[in-house]
Amino acid sequence: MKPYPIKFVSIVIPVYNERQSLPELLRRTEAACEQLDHRFEIVLVDDGSRDDSTDILQRAAERADSPFVAVILNRNYGQHAAIMAGFEQCQGDVVITLDADLQNPPEEIPRLVKLAEQGYDVVGTVRSNRQDSAWRRWPSKLINLAVQRSTGVAMNDYGCMLRAYRRTIVDAMLACRERSTFIPILANSFARHTTEVLVDHAEREHGDSKYSPMRLINLMFDLITCMTTTPLRLLSIIGFSMALLGVLFAALLIVLRLIFGASWAGDGMFVLFAVLFVFTGGQFIGMGLLGEYLGRMYSDVRARPRFFIEKIVRSSSPVATDSIDSSVTPYMNKVAP
């Protein structure tokens, strides 16, 4: 592993209804970046916020000699789509992603940059003393285990978005045009050298988590379908096993009927109904998984954009865009020679 020279650092932060957190987020993130011996930009992607977040981001970007870049999406597309929009607009040799809720400290940015300079393609983080509820922690552990087995990359916390990516990894992810993606997994599929570090995890001080139960379910399906096609293979195995169990159980029912007569279980009606419901449920599970894959393939075949950037604001210069492929030379904040 060879050292990786870094001249310019980009920070990408997706924002959705974080009006109360933004002033502290902007202050702490800029202060952390000023500790770097590199030029930097802080790309803030507004993911269709309905509060005052958009106005706050634009004012920050319009400030004279501002290191902030405001990327305004026309509606809410989700956290990972917003990060990809930030990836398209940033130009750093290393790109760091960070959540806007301040549960992960921006002060860790210099440490991640130093690790990236050592030659790591991806620098992940593990939340120590995680301050989420148990119903969020346990599913996360199961997902991390499933991802490790599917990708072969042993990382312990795929849910923590405080991460550093080498430019080549970011470019590789941008070349992937699928609509449903999970960035940490996608990055690790291209990375050769990865590492993880422990970071603090604070309680959310303002607002609530933007991951509702339905969003978590959608995220789970994104994880399943972007990692592997193994569930499709499992369908045939499960179907064969269920059919075999059905035959054996039917034979058992016949034997019991011959021995004890038809009255032993209500003429067998309730047992047959139970068996019918079990196997029907299994079929619907399989059909649902198959439908998820087909639906996502349909979305990819249509080749619609994953997001639409309404406006880009950088250093008092709002730039309207007509497509997601608009390119603007990034503002380079000269905080160090």
Curated annotation (Swiss-Prot):
A Pfam family that this protein carries is Glycos_transf_2
List the cysteine pairs that form cystine: none
Bilayer-spanning residue ranges: 235-255, 270-290
What top-level class of enzyme does the UniProt entry assign?
transferase
Report a single Gene Ontology molecular function: undecaprenyl-phosphate 4-deoxy-4-formamido-L-arabinose transferase activity
Which keywords has UniProt assigned to this entry? Answer: Antibiotic resistance, Cell inner membrane, Cell membrane, Glycosyltransferase, Lipid A biosynthesis, Lipid biosynthesis, Lipid metabolism, Lipopolysaccharide biosynthesis, Membrane, Transferase, Transmembrane, Transmembrane helix
Q: How does the UniProt record describe the way this protein sits in the membrane? A: Multi-pass membrane protein
Annotated compartments = Cell inner membrane
Which InterPro entries does the record cross-reference, listed alphabetically? Answer: ArnC_tfrase (IPR022857), Glyco_trans_2-like (IPR001173), Glycosyltransferase_2 (IPR050256), Nucleotide-diphossugar_trans (IPR029044)
Reactions catalysed according to its record: UDP-4-deoxy-4-formamido-beta-L-arabinose + di-trans,octa-cis-undecaprenyl phosphate = 4-deoxy-4-formamido-alpha-L-arabinopyranosyl di-trans,octa-cis-undecaprenyl phosphate + UDP
This protein's pathway: Glycolipid biosynthesis; 4-amino-4-deoxy-alpha-L-arabinose undecaprenyl phosphate biosynthesis; 4-amino-4-deoxy-alpha-L-arabinose undecaprenyl phosphate from UDP-4-deoxy-4-formamido-beta-L-arabinose and undecaprenyl phosphate: step 1/2; Bacterial outer membrane biogenesis; lipopolysaccharide biosynthesis
Q: Give yes or no: UniProt keyword Transferase.
A: yes
Record's GO cellular component terms: plasma membrane
| UniProt EC number | 2.4.2.53
> Which superkingdom, per the lineage?
Bacteria
Q: Per the UniProt entry, what are the Gene Ontology biological process annotations, in alphabetical order?
A: 4-amino-4-deoxy-alpha-L-arabinopyranosyl undecaprenyl phosphate biosynthetic process; lipid A biosynthetic process; lipopolysaccharide biosynthetic process; response to antibiotic
Q: What does this protein do?
A: Catalyzes the transfer of 4-deoxy-4-formamido-L-arabinose from UDP to undecaprenyl phosphate. The modified arabinose is attached to lipid A and is required for resistance to polymyxin and cationic antimicrobial peptides.
Family per UniProt?
Answer: Belongs to the glycosyltransferase 2 family.
> What protein name does the entry list?
Undecaprenyl-phosphate 4-deoxy-4-formamido-L-arabinose transferase
| Organism listed in the record | Pseudomonas syringae pv. syringae (strain B728a)
